[in-house]
Amino acid sequence: DDNPALAEVFEEAGMPLVRLFTPGEANKTLPLVKRIVSDIVDIGRRLRQMAATLGPNADEDEEVKRLLVEFQGVLREMEQLGCSYKDYNFDIGLVDFPAVIDGEAVVLCWRSDEPSVMYYHGLYAGFAGRKAIPEALLEPEEIV
């Protein structure tokens, strides 16, 4: 992880590099990541609903202020783990884990309706560019 050039590649893609993950390591964090994603989606939906109800003055509402602080806290938890939350529509939790596959800086990509981290994509490919993680990189119990 002490590769400054690699850190720069992730930084340029808007993803500060806290650590790199193997598919196995990403999957081991999932119980905690799932809890954090659940909190993010819940708070995000509540904020969106309150903004629609309260209109332009929503940011002055005490409950909105409290929720925003809570929201920033759970996002920070996610960042401290080294991964990034990606679904700000709050439809479904989407999380990227920085990784290197075949010498290329990529992100392992997990959706909250998936049982494990099974896909990855290039830093700029986005969700539409997802590919299956090569089986050789998965733990035997992760191969579906």
Regions found by a protein language model. Give the residues of each.
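Hydrophobic stripe of amphipathic alpha-helices that form coiled-coil interfaces
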Residues: M50, L54-N57, L81, Y85
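A generic structural signal for short, solvent-exposed coil/turn residues
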Residues: A13-M15, E77, V100
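Glycine-rich, aromatic-bearing surface loops/beta-hairpins
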Residues: C83-V144
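Short amphipathic alpha-helical coiled-coil/interface segments
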Residues: V64-M78
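A generic "functional-site adjacency" signal
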Residues: R19-L20, Q72, D102
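Intrinsically disordered/linker segments and immediately adjacent domain-edge residues
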Residues: A58-E62
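Long, hydrophobic N-terminal alpha-helical segment
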Residues: D1-G55
